[in-house]
Amino acid sequence: MPPAPLITIVDDDDFLRNSLNNLLRSVGMRTHSFSSAEEFLNSNELHDTDCLLLDVRMPGMSGLDLQRQLNASNSRIPIVFITSHADDDARARALAAGAVAFLYKPCRKEALLEAIDLALNHKVP
């Protein structure tokens, strides 16, 4: 049996990271979490990640900047953005650059799990 999908959470909000970790583990997924894009890029999780849950606005490198860097390196990690800032321009840029979904905090559990499922089932090898 293949291992459970690894969902990596990159968000500067400690409470949200912990909540997402608990939710995703409760439905059988493995998780890793990071408080910044830089921390994620410097980790060993980059190549093992099956789906990336990514905040848009963070200190240092933004989620959109991380997406650009991953795209430039030909990364195939599907990205689901989660943000508390209603920003139509950021949403349009993220989706145009290949994000699977762009959700607003707080989002419904069902919407998040549906977006992750979509990302996992449309992952490019």
Where are each of the predicted segments found?
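Short, conserved "switch-loop" micro-motifs in signal-transduction and mechanochemical regulators
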Residues: S73, S84-A86
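Receiver (REC) domain active-site loop signature in two-component systems and cognate sites
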Residues: M58
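Two-component/phosphorelay signaling modules centered on CheY-like receiver
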Residues: D14-H32
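Acidic catalytic/metal-coordinating carboxylates
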Residues: S35-S36, S62-D65
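Acidic, metal-coordinating helix/loop segments flanking the phosphotransfer/catalytic sites
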Residues: S33-C51
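C-terminal output helix
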Residues: D89, C107-I116
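Active-site residues of response regulator receiver
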Residues: D55, T83
